[in-house]
């Protein structure tokens, strides 16, 4: 690591810009647009004594680094999606939109081994043969260094959930 202290911070008002919505250059925005985020990312660099704010399209709460070549920083804290920052890409480009990604939590309920749209949405009558999207406040998050998956806890719906997210080789599409 670079000795920075990463944290979550409020960077702006909740309404997301068009960069977080369909038509954006960000693949996550086109795959699963987000309209708002209440808390974002930041870090303090002790060497320069500077604070850097990073606007994220997803809300953040808890954060954890993965053991991967991109020094991926995973975030819980959104009810609709799980987010990440590719800190290697951030360091190379300084482009907050290009360095971030997110995806919804969708279960392969049709059993075909892939997550495909359209899926069953929360609160709607399920359609047979579709995968199912889950929502709820994502509280804790921990990457698994053995297989690259990410484990999250959800506080809602009661009594809560423990979910394993496999980002695949081309997130958010896999």
Question: How would you name each of these model-derived features?
Answer:
Residues 7-36, 79-105, 155-163:
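Short, conserved, GDST-rich strand-edge loop motifs in beta-rich repeat architectures
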């Amino acid at each position: 690591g670079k000795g920075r202290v990463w944290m979550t911070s409020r960077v702006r008002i909740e309404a997301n810009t068009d960069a977080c919505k369909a038509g954006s250059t960000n693949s996550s925005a086109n795959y699963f647009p987000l309209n708002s985020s209440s808390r974002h990312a930041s870090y303090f660099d002790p060497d320069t004594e500077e604070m850097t704010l990073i606007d994220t399209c997803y809300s953040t709460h808890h954060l954890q680094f993965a053991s991967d070549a991109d020094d991926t920083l995973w975030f819980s804290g959104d009810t609709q999606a799980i987010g990440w920052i590719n800190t290697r890409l951030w360091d190379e480009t300084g482009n907050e939109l290009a360095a971030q990604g997110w995806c919804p939590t969708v279960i392969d309920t049709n059993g075909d081994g892939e997550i495909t749209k359209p899926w069953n949405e929360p609160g709607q009558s399920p359609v047979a043969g579709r995968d199912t999207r889950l929502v709820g406040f994502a509280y804790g998050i921990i990457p698994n260094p053995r297989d690259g998956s990410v484990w999250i806890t959800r506080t809602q719906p009661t009594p809560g959930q423990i979910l394993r997210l496999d980002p695949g080789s081309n997130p958010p599409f896999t």
